[in-house]
Amino acid sequence: MTVWPAETIPHTDDLYMRVHRQWTRDGAPVPGAFQNRDGGMSTEWAHYSTPDETRSRGRVPADNGVVKMHVGTVRGLPNQTVVHTPEKTNRAHTDVLGEKDEEVRLKFCRICSWVIDPPRTPTKRSSK
């Protein structure tokens, strides 16, 4: 059980989400970055987190960028619900619930903006 109560997140607030460099192409997130895992898409409520804190919670923080999404805009996407789901060690944890078909994932790509740029994926050098 969590020690933090679930709260109602205002439409005017923002969410942060880590995006691993494998889910980027040409500096932009690809639709596959926006998918449910364990029932929802894990994000963090900006009221209780910063972009740096969000990034630091990744397995290898340096492999991730962080995007920002406006809660009201996320709620305006088809069948998407924003629910504060705090965890014992992360009061900011928030799930975005709802099916994320290709159309919805493309819309997530359009509504997000980088607050921490992703690292460039190293390119393989050709041997001569």
Tell me the role of every PLM-derived stretch:
Residues 1-14, 22-128:
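Conserved NAD+-utilizing ADP-ribose enzyme module
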